[in-house]
């Protein structure tokens, strides 16, 4: 699969419509975490360097096709200006029609224009061809730098890419390269770590992975469901007992595909779910009836350590235990730090994604050591599920 990048495009003197993700958290009208804004800077600066005029398109929140003042991208303007010091950043109060048309016409080389929330128009989420055509009128080239919105076929992600010469921005390019290295044409053996609470939310993911990876590590609450499927009692632990048949199907599918599934060998149990709760480590088959499993134990960590050490590629989505609360973060921390260490030593390509995963790796102090950490959430999951992402498919040449 190939796609054009900024290196393939002649941008001199052209208005470049750039789909970005600036859907940042806000409190009292202030941006509390500008990470997503900072990530688009390389693309914007590259376009400026090539003599293009970047016009930014983005959504913000879920206004459902209506104008909602608290979801205006005007609120993001100060943080965007701060991320681009020395560059004039202007704002237009719509993303189609006379206002942005006039603002684009008035742009000088070296300036950036931010357009209003695309989701203020009901046609955005319906991928309305008329809205996409009205957006396309504003520029000569389209660049998608929002991998996080690539799983949605919207006017500004998919419709627009069909109407103008299109390329991937630097963030999108980095994401696609990392994902291609991890699951497209990976170096083997490939290990996937999948954690989290529920099997039901990750059925497609598990089903796709067993056919594509050599080892599948299952952790978190969903491991309990697999234990139940094998006739093991898990006390008061979180488990989806109605998913036991499905778990057994996944186990047999894995066996047929030659994928080894790793479940906890020992577990850390407690009677209450709170920081510093009295806890003990027991064999997986010996969970007391009045206790709940909150983490994988040291035997499990040691066994996984051997699996990781023999791997060449690792993909991670979801923690191995209740990482938010000490001491039930021990297995996740130990595994994350080892993966980071192997990656730094050049022995492993490691790609991680999903909100909880990123939080867990940051908490463990291991995030910096991974080859690539995706901030994309839903798009990362759908990519891991083997689904086509409309925003990426539209860029494919």
From Swiss-Prot:
Keyword Transferase: yes
Keywords associated with the record: ATP-binding, Cytoplasm, Glycolysis, Kinase, Nucleotide-binding, Transferase
Source organism, top-level taxon: Bacteria
Leader sequence segment: none
UniProt EC number: 2.7.2.3
Binding annotation for ATP: 202, 324, 354-357
InterPro entries in UniProt: Phosphoglycerate_kinase (IPR001576), Phosphoglycerate_kinase_CS (IPR015911), Phosphoglycerate_kinase_N (IPR015824), Phosphoglycerate_kinase_sf (IPR036043)
Pfam family name, one: PGK
Main location: cytoplasm
Cellular-component GO terms for this entry: cytosol
Pathway: Carbohydrate degradation; glycolysis; pyruvate from D-glyceraldehyde 3-phosphate: step 2/5
Gene Ontology molecular-function annotations: ADP binding; ATP binding; phosphoglycerate kinase activity
Binding site for substrate: 21-23, 36, 59-62, 119, 152
Nucleotide-binding keyword on record: yes
Biological processes per GO annotation: gluconeogenesis; glycolytic process
Catalyzed reactions: (2R)-3-phosphoglycerate + ATP = (2R)-3-phospho-glyceroyl phosphate + ADP
SUPFAM superfamilies: Phosphoglycerate kinase
Annotated localization: Cytoplasm
Quaternary structure and partners: Monomer.
PANTHER family: PHOSPHOGLYCERATE KINASE (PTHR11406), PHOSPHOGLYCERATE KINASE 1, CHLOROPLASTIC-RELATED (PTHR11406:SF23)
Family affiliation: Belongs to the phosphoglycerate kinase family.
Protein name (record): Phosphoglycerate kinase
Organism field: Cereibacter sphaeroides (strain ATCC 17029 / ATH 2.4.9)
Lineage: Bacteria, Pseudomonadati, Pseudomonadota, Alphaproteobacteria, Rhodobacterales
């Amino acid at each position: 699969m190939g796609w054009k990048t900024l290196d393939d495009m002649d941008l001199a003197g052209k208005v470049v419509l750039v789909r970005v993700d600036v859907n940042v958290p806000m409190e009292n009208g202030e941006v509390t975490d500008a990470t997503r804004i900072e990530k688009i800077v390389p693309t914007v600066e590259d376009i400026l360097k090539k003599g293009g005029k970047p016009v930014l398109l983005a959504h913000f929140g879920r206004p459902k096709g209506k104008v909602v003042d608290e979801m205006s991208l005007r609120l993001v303007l100060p943080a965007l200006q701060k991320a681009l010091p020395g560059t004039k950043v202007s704002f237009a109060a719509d993303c189609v029609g006379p206002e942005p048309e006039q603002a684009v016409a008035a742009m000088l080389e070296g300036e950036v224009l931010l357009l209003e929330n695309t989701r203020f128009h009901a046609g955005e989420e319906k991928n309305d061809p008329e809205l996409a055509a009205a957006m396309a009128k504003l520029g000569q080239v389209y660049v998608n730098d929002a991998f996080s919105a690539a799983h949605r076929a919207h006017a500004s992600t998919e419709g627009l890419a069909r109407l103008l010469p299109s390329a991937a921005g630097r963030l999108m390019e980095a994401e696609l390269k990392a994902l291609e290295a991890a699951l497209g044409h990976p170096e083997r053996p490939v290990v996937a770590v999948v954690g989290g609470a529920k099997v039901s939310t990750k059925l497609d993911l598990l089903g796709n992975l067993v056919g594509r990876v050599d080892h599948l590590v299952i952790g978190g609450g969903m491991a309990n469901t697999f234990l139940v499927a094998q006739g093991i009692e898990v006390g008061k632990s979180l488990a989806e007992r109605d998913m036991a048949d499905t778990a057994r199907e996944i186990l047999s599918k894995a066996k047929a595909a030659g994928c080894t599934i790793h479940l906890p060998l020992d577990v850390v149990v407690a009677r209450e779910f709170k920081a510093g709760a009295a806890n003990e480590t027991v064999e997986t088959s010996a969970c007391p009836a009045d206790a709940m499993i909150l983490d994988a134990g040291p035997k499990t960590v040691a066994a996984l350590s051997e699996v990781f050490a023999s791997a060449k590629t690792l993909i991670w989505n979801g923690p191995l235990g209740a990482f938010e609360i000490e001491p039930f973060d021990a297995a996740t921390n130990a595994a994350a730090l080892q993966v980071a260490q192997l990656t730094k030593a050049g022995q492993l390509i490691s790609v991680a994604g999903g909100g909880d995963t990123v939080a867990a790796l940051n908490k463990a102090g291991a995030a910096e050591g991974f080859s690539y950490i995706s901030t994309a959430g839903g798009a990362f999951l759908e990519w891991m599920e083997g689904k086509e992402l409309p925003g990426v498919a539209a860029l494919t040449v």
